[in-house]
Structures are given as structure tokens and as C-alpha cells.
Curated annotation (Swiss-Prot):
Residues 1-21 form the signal peptide. SUPFAM superfamilies: Concanavalin A-like lectins/glucanases. Belongs to the leguminous lectin family. Monomer. GO terms for molecular function: carbohydrate binding. The keyword Oxidoreductase does not apply. This is Non-seed lectin. InterPro entries: ConA-like_dom_sf, L-lectin, Legume_lectin_dom, Leguminous_Lectin. It comes from Pisum sativum (Garden pea).
């Protein structure tokens, strides 16, 4: 875990302001709550939007709560996001922030987890992706195309021996990890920044107790993903663990040959 120094925080905030000020080809949306009937979000699997403005990715109402009942749910922004421009080769920079709560009412050792991911625009829940595969990886094939930030509750054979936050590139064998200080029922806030000139993906994780962790990895998104992508969340659980998104915002800017702004508030 890395503590965030003031100079580094100012640098990241500066990047955020640059992104927000550049109106070349941009997409922006902000959901302080995610209300039922929101057509800007596509639900897959067990995901549903609750009346209180929470996006529930997995089922958590099994009775008794100790029952083993696998659940997989995903939620995607319905509009494809321009990631890179084929004419210029330019790649978008973006900032996304979200908050979530994972609740483990059974008291058993929680399993599986949640991932924010970027994938091809036609992405669906893969076959063989339940449980430890977090709804993004088909365990029967090596062809999986995505970039993600995972919050993993359980150490599987391919994981570090701890609950962890990991940056994933086409695999759940994370390229970089830090410890995930999970507390059932607590609100976690996340900001992810991709700086395209440096190909740097950075995440800042703020826990409810004020503790801050960071994780960063160099990744060329143009080499991994198509020019238009889907962005969203996926979660899996094997017991009655709920993975709930409370808020989500996203802003991207791409220097392209023609420009427009797409906004959803």
C-alpha cells in the first residue's frame, strides 16, 4: 500500500482539470445515484437497479445466507466510448470515479469480488466466468480482451496470498497488486486516471476510515483494445455477498480529426 503525497495528488488533480477543459472529442456522464429506468446503463446477468438508487451487481437475498448460490452480474454504459482514433493514432485520456459497498451478511469468508473493466463494445458475460473469474474471463480459453481494476476478496491459486486490488490486462493474473483492506458494509471511493501521453493507468482508493492506497501501471490501451469500447462493472459471488455501486462518473477526451461532445448527466 502506498500513501499519497501532496505533490503527487496535485499532479493527478491537474490532469483531471486538463481532461475536463479539453473539448475535442469527449464523452462525459455523472450518476450521483443510479435510479431505476436508467436507459444509459445496460444490465447483464443478475445485475439490477434498486429503488434506493443503488446498482446491485450480485444477488444477496438467498435464504439462509450461508447457502452456496453463485451469482454473476455486470453493468455497462450503453454508449460505446471512443478510445483511439484510427486516422491520427491518438489515444483518449480519461478519468472515472465510483463508490461501492460490498456487504457480507453471512459472516463466512467472503469470496469473489468486483472489477471495473474496459472491453470491446459487444462484450457479454463470457462462458465459464463465474466465481473467481469475476464475470470477465472465460476460464476455458486464453483469449480474453479487457483491461480492469479488480477488488478481489479471495486468494485463488493464481492470486497473491491476500485480498487485493489488481490491475488486469487480458488476464486475472494481475500485473500489479496492492492489499485490499476490505471491511464489510463500508463505502469505498475510487478514482481511475488514464494519461495517454505516458500510457499510465493510476487508481486512487479511499476507504471509509480515510486511509488511501494507490496503484499504477504502464499500459498501451491501443495495443490491447479496439478503437471503441464499453466501460462498466462486473462482480461475482459464490455465497450471499452483495456488490453495490452507489455512484459513477466518467469523462474522456480524445484528440481526433473531428470533434464532438457527448454528455449524459
Amino acid at each position: 500500500m502506498a500513501l499519497y503525497r501532496t505533490k503527487e495528488l496535485v499532479s493527478l488533480v491537474s490532469i483531471m482539470f486538463v481532461l475536463l477543459a479539453t473539448n475535442i472529442e469527449a464523452l462525459s456522464f455523472n450518476f450521483p445515484k443510479i435510479t431505476p429506468g436508467n436507459t444509459a446503463i445496460t444490465l447483464q446477468g443478475n445485475a439490477k437497479i434498486l429503488a434506493n438508487g443503488v446498482l446491485a451487481l450480485t444477488n444477496s437475498t438467498q435464504i439462509p445466507p450461508t447457502t452456496t448460490f453463485p451469482s454473476t452480474g455486470r453493468a455497462l454504459y450503453s454508449t460505446p466510448v471512443p478510445l483511439w482514433d484510427s486516422a491520427t493514432g491518438n489515444v483518449a485520456s480519461f478519468v472515472t470515479s465510483f463508490s461501492f459497498v460490498i456487504l457480507n451478511p453471512s459472516g463466512r469468508v467472503p469470496t469473489d469480488g468486483l472489477v471495473f473493466f474496459i472491453a470491446p463494445p459487444d462484450t457479454e458475460i463470457p462462458n465459464n466466468s463465474q466465481s473467481q473469474y469475476l464475470g470477465v474471463v472465460d476460464s476455458k480459453t486464453s483469449i480474453n480482451r479487457f483491461v480492469g481494476l479488480e477488488f478481489d476478496l479471495y486468494a485463488n491459486s493464481f492470486d497473491p496470498y491476500m485480498r487485493h486490488i489488481g490491475i488486469d490486462i487480458n488476464s486475472l493474473i494481475s500485473t500489479k497488486t496492492v492489499r485490499y483492506n476490505f471491511v464489510s458494509g463500508s463505502l469505498t471511493k475510487v478514482t481511475i486516471i488514464y494519461d495517454s501521453p505516458s500510457n499510465t493507468l493510476t487508481a486512487v482508493i479511499t476507504y471509509e476510515n480515510g486511509q488511501i492506497s494507490t496503484i499504477s501501471q504502464n499500459v498501451d490501451l491501443k495495443a490491447v483494445l479496439p478503437k471503441d469500447v464499453s466501460v462498466g462493472f462486473s462482480a461475482t459471488s459464490t455465497i450471499a455477498v452483495s456488490h453495490n455501486i452507489h455512484s459513477w462518473s466518467f469523462t474522456s477526451n480524445l484528440e481526433a480529426t473531428t470533434g464532438n461532445i457527448v454528455s449524459q448527466v
